[in-house]
Amino acid sequence: MQIQALTTQTIIGIIVSIFLILLGIAVFALICWGVFHVFVLWLRYRNRESLSLNSVLLQVTVPRENETKIDAAEQLFASLYALYGTTRFEYFRPQPHLTFEIVGLPGDIRFYVNVPAKYRDFVEKEINGAFPEADILPVNDPAAKQRGGMVIGTEYNIFSDNGKVAFMWMNLKGADYLPIRIYKDLAVDPLSSVTSILGKMMEGEGAAIQILIQPASNHWKKVGRSYIGNVKKNEANPDKASYKADAKELEAVENKLSKYGFNTTIRVVVCAKTQESANAHLSNIKGVFSQFNYMNMFKKRWQFFRGLFMTDFIYRYFPMIRGTSVLTSEELASIYHFPNKSIITPGIHWLNAKRSAAPSNLATSGLYLGRSTYRGLARPIYIERDDRRRHMYIIGKTGTGKTEFLKSMIIQDIMNGEGVAVIDPHGDLVEDILQVIPPKRAEDVILFDPSDYERPMGFNIMEADTEQQKHFAANSLIGLMYKLFDPNKTGIVGPRFEHAVRNAMLTVMYEKGSTLIEVMRVLTDQTYVQELLPKVEDPIIRRYWTDQIAQTSDFHKSEVLDYITSKFGRFVTNKMIRNIIGQSESSFSFRKVMDEQKILLINLSKGTIGEENSNFLGLVLVPKLLVAAMSRQDMPMSERKDFFFYVDEFQNFATPDFAQILSEARKYRLNLIVANQFIGQMEEEIKNAIFGNVGTVASFRVGVTDANYLSHEFQPIFNEHDLINVDKYNCFARTLVGGEPVQPFSLDTTKDIAKEKAMENPRVAELVKELSRLKFGKAVAGVEAEIQRRSNL
């Protein structure tokens, strides 16, 4: 009995020992398994902070009128499955993940995609492949400064001071292989409900929906196929058949299994002024996802550690252990896609106007115009000297960036030592240019400022060296009178007016140093006419006075001549204008300005000298510059230096002479750059000359009427909608390369304001002004004395 008891105890002891050994082995194995998985998790995610910081947030914007269907988003997600890695050590490396986000702020709903920097190009190409009209801008590109690029903006911020936060994360309630309701089974675009909720954010509120996706392995498909197999097997056996899933549901499961799958988690964060408001918004967003309820549905999961959740949200961390469900490309497209014209929610940030890449054969040097930014690629745009000789026309509403564009080109020309003339009817452009004049070019500056009453510069309209120039001056003044007093050719200025003015001007020009003052005298002083007639060599002009005027009755003579003098009188009696046009010798020669590559800045500010005086001076200055250019006929083409003539609001100074500049000035190396606000400001002749001869057209934002006209210039790339909605400081350009036209493209003219400010030197500007007025102006007392002596006032 003792032996038997001993044997039983021994056996029990052995069994216990074996059990303890096995338990120890199991515990050890479990510990090893746990340690191994902890090690794997550490190995996978040890660098997730640096990976997060090295990601790029892309803002994706599409045109309001786009008709892209949701299928395009499904195509996009399917293509992103190519990121799935199948290397030998894939278990130890996390699959790359992307974050698709919708952000709602007061009156502003935007769409973003966060992508690891190394996959940025691939993702951008796939987005553009699915949504060709989409515009993609980096928001927080960490490599932007390293590449010498420009950071577009800062990352969005839904949080506010003293705001209350509500948050949640969601995944599927059921098995991964069970589908949710997809967009094909919904009557309306599911995105409409999402944007409607986000569009209700008030001041101090904000919400963000993050959808994090990561390519999934096929394990979920194996489980799903096993489920289908079991269901079909059971239904084939009448004793086991339960008919839990009908044929349509099984078809839906099979459809899901045929698609690419992504491990997915959805995070939602709301900030509001009160906790009640934040909770209400969060509940509304959660409710929106109920539209996808089918065989599966989204379930809100509890997050007990707020700090950890917010860290995951801000860094866009993918869940390390649990918290994901598998959604297919079709299901993801149902939840997230870019809006089209069917979404009418107010506040969506639409792409105002599409972009188009610049042609590859554009110049790589010359005058810098701006950047062409298209599909993530930015390149500088230049125009060569020979193509600039075909002139440039710039159009756009006020405040769209025209003047800044002009200023950028003018400054470059000045820095490059070019000859430049600028007519500015506002004054700000000239003042800005003076601030950046390099000291080495201070001597080249001629500042023509009519508002300088103390030292007026002389500008003699009547100066002419040849018979051709005399007739051109007469025609220019007659054109000026039509522009000012009879723009519609109603007869206010007619043939009799032209005939009298032309003969009066040609008569006084036989007396060297004559001015418009003398024209007034010859029209009113018969004694003065008799003094001049012996000097008049042209018999036709002489007979005008001896025959035609002499035989006209005093009544009709005074009627015609008084009418003419009344038109000229308003300028001659204006002391400021009289002290300028009444000087017998001009303060500077336009020909020398061009040949010696001077900087002529003409400040015709309407605010200081009046609109009528501004227009008058501009209308007499422009023809003089043309005469100077045409006088270059006496020098070989190779010796004619380029001179760049900039005119802002040029319609105020556009006479038929402008059409001649456009058609003939190129051969004289007078290159015109003009800007105005709308086409209707131009006369038909000028408009035809502009669009018939100008080589480069840059259109900033315009009105409906102009968009209709200009759309023909930019077809088929841009349409009326684009021209009406182009962003500020952006334009559409049509230009030449080697004299040949190229397709239109979008141009971003924004510049480094800080760099430009650093160039400004107010002290140099003041010195340049003073130097110019002392060098070219005359003391007002001497000017008035000379005019009084010559006019017998």
What spans do the regions from the language model cover?
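Extended, folded cores of ATP/NTP-driven motor/assembly subunits in large transport
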Residues: 3-358, 453-456, 534-536, 548
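N-terminal pre-Walker A segment at the start of P-loop NTPase domains
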Residues: 361-380
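P-loop NTPase motor domains
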Residues: 371-377, 385-387, 392, 397-398, ...
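C-terminal anchoring/interaction modules
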Residues: 741-744, 753-793
